[in-house]
């Protein structure tokens, strides 16, 4: 996984990063996006939950209350809102500028002592590692519970048919 890499990781997000796209970005240390970027975890609208770490990483990054709201509602988040809540570090006008910003940050990090950078990353990440591991195991268990429900099938069917799903709690 990205977060297990010894070196810092930087994501550049341009456009929609919904569901797994947001979850992938959450795995990185630093996130830079364009002004047109959109984030969100819409899985509950399909009668499933974020299953790639979103329920564990998002609350750690932006706080439990806001994370619950975003996961429960499936609301989309604009780039500026993502910046204000701490979901991203920088918002740039376009992809080229976002990429330049990411490279600038990477170069700045590259000028620092590599052993110190690795140690700092390990110390920061290690502060919650055991809790994160348990949380990810719990998320996977809950994801498996919803994976084979009739509601999930209805959610996927409704999505494909571009209509609102009708759930029955089964």
Predicted regions located by residue number:
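CoA-thioester-processing core
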Residues: 1-4, 12, 18-72, 85, ...
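C-terminal long alpha-helix characteristic of the crotonase
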Residues: 32-37, 79, 88-137, 141-150, ...
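Hydrophobic alpha-helical segments typical of transmembrane helices
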Residues: 54-57, 66, 116-119, 139-142, ...
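Short alpha-helical scaffolding segments that buttress acidic/His motifs in well-ordered protein cores
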Residues: 70-71, 120-123, 159
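Short aromatic/basic micro-patch
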Residues: 76
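Short, basic/aromatic-enriched C-terminal tail that caps enzymatic domains
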Residues: 155-170
């Amino acid at each position: 996984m990205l977060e297990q890499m010894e070196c810092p990781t930087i994501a550049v997000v341009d456009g929609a990063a919904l569901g797994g796209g947001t979850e992938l970005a959450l795995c990185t240390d630093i996130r830079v996006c364009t002004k047109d970027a959109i984030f969100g975890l819409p899985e509950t609208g399909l009668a499933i939950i974020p299953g790639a770490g979103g329920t564990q990483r998002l609350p750690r990054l932006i706080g439990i209350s806001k994370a619950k709201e975003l996961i429960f509602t499936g609301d989309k988040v604009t780039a500026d809102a993502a910046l204000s809540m701490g979901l991203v570090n920088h918002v740039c006008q376009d992809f080229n500028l976002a990429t330049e910003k990411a490279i600038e940050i990477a170069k700045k990090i590259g000028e620092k002592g590599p052993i110190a950078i690795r140690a700092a990353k390990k110390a920061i990440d290690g502060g919650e590692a055991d809790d994160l591991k348990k949380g990810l195991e719990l998320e996977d268990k809950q994801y498996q519970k919803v994976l084979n429900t009739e509601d999930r099938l209805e959610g996927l069917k409704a999505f494909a048919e571009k209509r609102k799903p009708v759930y029955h709690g089964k």
